[in-house]
Design a protein with these regions (language model features):
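Hydrophobic ligand-binding cavity/cleft-lining segments
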Residues: 1-55
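Short, P/G- and charge-enriched loop/turn segments at secondary-structure junctions
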Residues: 4-7, 76-83, 111-113
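Short, surface-exposed coil-to-beta transition loops
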Residues: 17, 51, 87-91, 117-122
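Short beta-edge strand/loop motif at the mouth of beta-sheet-based domains
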Residues: 18, 38-87
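A short, structured loop/turn motif at beta-sheet edges
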Residues: 26-28, 56-61, 95-102, 125-134, ...
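Hydrophobic pocket/interface hotspot
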Residues: 30, 40, 64-66, 94, ...
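Beta-strand/loop substructures that line and gate deep hydrophobic ligand-binding cavities in soluble
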Residues: 95-96, 104-156
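Short, highly charged C-terminal tails/helix-capping segments
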Residues: 164-173
Length: 173
């Protein structure tokens, strides 16, 4: 089931896919990073931001609450320039869960000044890939092309954190 379209979302915007393979990682590792407070908090958010996960209830209909916090000086300055808060509460719901295979998360986008609140869906598919694990993330477009571009850059940025987080996880084994 598709979430309601973002207000004013151009029909020409397509969903964005991120296909990542991680050698020497297990699907269970990637699943952990999406589905636990500790895991999600270890990598979510673009570089220069951090999150504090307040609630993660992993079940269909379960809630995810976290604070997205601008932490680096450049990001703080950029947020101020855009008249955006340095910290904003973010909430979402787990829409569909197939353990170690499929995860759908619907965020409520309600923090953009002058834009009506809307839902934004992220779908993640997990699989084994050679000696490692693969995840394909599909992200719906946002309310306009500019925000879709910023969100794409943000996802690209936060995905660069995963190799280090996975290496740290594997060093503890």
């Amino acid at each position: 089931m598709k979430s309601p379209a973002a207000p004013d979302a151009p029909a020409t915007q397509a969903a964005i896919k991120f296909d990542r393979r991680y050698e020497d990682a297990a699907v269970e590792d990637l699943w952990h990073l999406w589905t636990t407070k500790e895991g999600f908090g270890s990598w979510w958010g673009p570089k220069g931001f951090r999150v504090e996960v307040r609630k993660l209830d992993l079940r269909e209909g379960g809630e995810l609450f976290y604070d997205m916090i601008a932490a680096a000086p450049e990001e703080i300055a950029a947020m101020k320039k855009m008249n955006m808060p340095l910290t904003h509460a973010t909430r979402g719901t787990f829409a569909r869960i197939e353990p170690l295979k499929h995860l759908e998360l619907i965020h409520v986008i309600d923090f953009i000044p002058g834009v009506k609140s809307y839902e934004h869906r992220i779908v993640v598919e997990f699989s084994i890939s050679g000696r490692g694990a693969q995840m394909v993330i599909t992200v719906e477009p946002h309310h306009n092309a500019e925000w879709t571009k910023m969100a794409t850059m943000g996802m690209e940025s936060q995905l660069t954190k995963l190799p280090g987080v996975l290496a740290h996880m594997n060093s503890g084994r």
